[in-house]
Amino acid sequence: MKKFYLLILSLTLTCAAFAQPRAKYVFYFIGDGMGVNQVDGAETYLAALEGRIGVKSLCFTQFPYAAFVTTYSATNGVTDSAAGGTALATGHKTKNGAISVLKDLQTPVYSVAEAAQRGGAAVGISTSVTVD
């Protein structure tokens, strides 16, 4: 699921780079912990609220592109937040506990936000959780 969001961001940024006129805003949403079962549950719940059997589609399930991916880190079957965030932001897997470096822990990798900023875009990052 994490690569899905990276794919969507990559496609959006690519389209923005080659489209005329240039996109004014690009949003990259990350549904942490959200998989197919969570989406299906939400759609089933929304349909039930309307007294229907079946699903009521969420808007993002209607996007023209989607992908299914593996979400393990470079060294573990279960990804932690550091490795997951690095993969989402940079497109590179790393070791659990590592942030913005490859699994060798020496080679830095840069986020799509940094690339956008270098390209002249204004960048903002928001979260719904505290940074501990």
Q: How would you name each of these model-derived features?
A:
Residues 15-19:
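Sec/Tat signal peptide C-region and signal peptidase I cleavage site
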Residues 4-13:
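Sec-dependent N-terminal signal peptides
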Residues 20-132:
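N-terminal catalytic scaffold of extracellular/periplasmic and nuclease hydrolases
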